[in-house]
């Protein structure tokens, strides 16, 4: 997954390019669209420090072809009490898929080439984008657009087989909590956070999500390439969103997973 800021920024860039009517519908349900931008990553944050069926679902979904989720999502939208609300979440998810499927093949290849971890490569890209946008990666709270509520959890939960409304709400709240924990501007807090994650067996994952005080030189090349891929994914996402909103058949793009293949 390109990390939190990249998906957030990407979703805003794509939204600005959509036809007026569709954009207006999504703006009415912007919070759901914004949560959808993080795709199955949302489930990672359910009781994040312990492995469980809900957060493992996030990993499982990343390895599935896009058609698996988006075929199910169509049925969920059709049966939803508020179809526009459900569609807004699904179209945010399309954005996530477009960026992931475009970037992940390169990220995995660069992991093998450089030895830098997957999460660190993506977090370094996040940080590069924030610096480009005049933001401080150490201080900017990247999950400020996530607005947990039971009403939104009721819309989102049906998209995930076997996941309850309570679990979905807990995952949303967990996303906020984890990002607060990882916003380690103070060097002492940073040490405490990373040491605690090492004890919990989550060091590699969490270390990659904590912003480095200085850019990692090994990630300069990857950040430049990922920005190129990001730009190519924008028109792809616009097209896929328009097609999905018009209920057109899923194209060949959905044969790709959210991951490398």
Where are these regions (language model features)?
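N-terminal leader/auxiliary helical segments
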Residues: 1-90, 94-261
């Amino acid at each position: 997954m390109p990390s939190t800021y990249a998906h957030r920024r990407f979703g805003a860039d794509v939204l600005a390019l959509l036809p007026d009517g569709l954009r207006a519908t999504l703006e009415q349900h912007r919070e759901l669209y914004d949560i959808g931008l993080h795709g199955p990553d949302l489930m990672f944050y359910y009781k994040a420090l312990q492995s469980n069926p809900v957060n493992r679902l996030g990993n499982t979904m990343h390895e599935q072809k896009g058609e698996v989720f988006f075929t199910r999502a169509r049925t969920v939208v059709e049966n939803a009490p508020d179809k526009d609300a459900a569609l807004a979440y699904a179209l945010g998810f399309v954005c996530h898929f477009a960026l992931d499927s475009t970037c992940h093949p390169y990220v995995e290849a660069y992991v093998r080439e450089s030895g830098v971890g997957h999460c660190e490569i993506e977090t370094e890209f996040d940080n590069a984008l924030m610096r480009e946008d005049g933001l401080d990666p150490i201080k900017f709270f990247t999950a400020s657009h996530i607005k947990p509520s039971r009403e939104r959890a009721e819309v989102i939960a049906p998209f995930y087989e076997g996941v309850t409304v309570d679990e979905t709400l807990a995952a949303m709240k967990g996303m906020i909590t984890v990002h607060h924990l990882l916003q380690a501007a103070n060097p002492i807090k940073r040490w405490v956070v990373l040491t605690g994650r090492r004890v919990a067996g989550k060091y590699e994952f969490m270390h990659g999500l904590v912003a480095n005080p200085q850019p990692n030189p090994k990630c300069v090349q990857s950040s430049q390439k990922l920005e190129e891929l990001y730009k190519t994914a924008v028109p792809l996402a616009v097209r896929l969103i328009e097609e999905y909103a018009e209920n057109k058949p899923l194209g060949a793009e959905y044969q790709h997973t959210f991951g490398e293949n």
